[in-house]
């Protein structure tokens, strides 16, 4: 006689918005469209977005990822190269032109806006203070828009407290788009306290998607025994969501790339789990994690939606006449199962 074993109850607070933002969607679409328009291989400088599963899915379609342009073989110089969503220094397109490469720029339009804000400060004679994380590709790209010596990087409130500019009266700040909203507010407040004349950008540099995802996590996290963020360890916005969840009241918060990374032995007695995804994480991985919990718990989904996102960014003019198939669109939107490579080759 078979006796059914009841599963313990669990509520999953599913955040919305989560996952792909308009800039990520556009960048992935550019690579897919380039492959359809020009054929394989299409080269991509740096990971198009910080998610290995997106990268491996594009590699399966014929994309080749490189870190520098000199890695592109001479026999493939006529194939396009795509610049990642994070943006690049001015020296990169200059290098591409010198090498007679055809390039497509997939820089997020909101990152490009920060570039313009920084250049405007510099044109007006202000030394630019960039609030961001050293070594992040977006920060490297933004600093690379300006002449050497005209921009300084500040990461923390402590940095802002010891920063000493040459001219305290002619400063302007911009920020990396994927920072913690609350942390950045503290850094800005310290800079404004020390340098009352410092000029803000005309519009907030932190992007709408970063803000929206953090707001949803703040709403869902209080009282959660565990909060899971789907994202890559090199994804700035995903790591910030982990921090936001802890500050908002989650007892524990982790960053995972696949359900296979969840340590079920360490979870213990839980009743409420929060779940979100960084802006470069496909929705199909969120679904995978929900199914993993359903296999072990009697789950109830509780949606924590703060706003509906409707933003959409156009792809490059050269690609607008190319049509995507239904399968292409599923991949671009993060909903295709072929966005996920086999778990054994996930590189975790």
UniProtKB/Swiss-Prot annotation:
Isopentenyl diphosphate binds at residues 50, 86, 136, 235-237, 280. (2E)-4-hydroxy-3-methylbut-2-enyl diphosphate binds at residues 50, 86, 136, 177, 235-237, 280. Binds 1 [4Fe-4S] cluster per subunit. The active site is at residue 138. It holds the Pfam family LYTB. Keywords: 4Fe-4S, Iron, Iron-sulfur, Isoprene biosynthesis, Metal-binding, Oxidoreductase. PANTHER family: 4-HYDROXY-3-METHYLBUT-2-ENYL DIPHOSPHATE REDUCTASE (PTHR30426:SF0). Belongs to the IspH family. This is 4-hydroxy-3-methylbut-2-enyl diphosphate reductase. The lineage of its organism: Bacteria, Pseudomonadati, Pseudomonadota, Alphaproteobacteria, Hyphomicrobiales.
């Amino acid at each position: 006689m078979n006796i059914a074993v009841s599963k313990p109850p669990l509520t999953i607070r599913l955040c919305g918005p989560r996952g792909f933002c308009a800039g990520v969607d556009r960048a992935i679409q550019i690579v897919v469209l380039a492959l359809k328009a020009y054929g394989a291989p299409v080269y991509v400088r740096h990971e198009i977005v910080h998610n290995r599963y997106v990268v491996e899915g594009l590699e399966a379609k014929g994309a080749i990822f490189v870190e520098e342009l000199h890695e592109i073989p001479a026999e493939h110089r006529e194939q396009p190269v795509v610049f990642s969503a994070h943006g690049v220094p001015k020296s990169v397109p200059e290098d591409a032109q010198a090498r007679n490469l055809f390039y497509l720029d997939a820089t997020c339009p909101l990152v490009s806006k920060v570039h313009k804000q920084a250049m405007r400060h510099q044109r007006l004679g202000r030394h630019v203070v960039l609030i961001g994380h050293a070594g992040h590709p977006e920060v490297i790209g933004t600093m690379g828009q300006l002449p050497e010596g005209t921009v300084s990087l500040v990461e923390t409130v402590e940095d802002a407290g010891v920063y000493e500019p040459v001219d305290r009266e002619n400063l302007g700040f911009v920020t990396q788009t994927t920072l913690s909203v609350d942390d950045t507010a503290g850094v800005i407040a310290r800079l404004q306290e020390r340098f009352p004349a410092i000029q803000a950008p005309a519009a907030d540099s932190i992007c709408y998607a970063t803000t929206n995802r953090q707001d949803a996590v703040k709403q869902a996290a209080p009282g959660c025994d565990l909060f899971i963020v789907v994202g890559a360890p090199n994804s700035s916005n995903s790591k910030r969501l982990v921090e936001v969840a802890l500050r908002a009241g989650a007892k524990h918060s982790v960053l995972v790339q696949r359900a296979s990374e969840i340590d079920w032995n360490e979870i213990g007695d839980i009743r409420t789990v929060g779940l979100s995804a960084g802006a470069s994480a496909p929705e199909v991985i969120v679904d995978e994690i929900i199914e993993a919990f359903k296999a072990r718990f009697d789950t109830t989904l509780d949606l924590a939606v703060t706003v509906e996102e409707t933003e959409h960014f156009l792809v490059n003019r050269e690609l607008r006449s190319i049509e995507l198939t239904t399968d292409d669109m599923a991949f671009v939107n993060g909903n295709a199962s072929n966005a996920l490579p086999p778990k054994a080759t996930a590189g975790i």
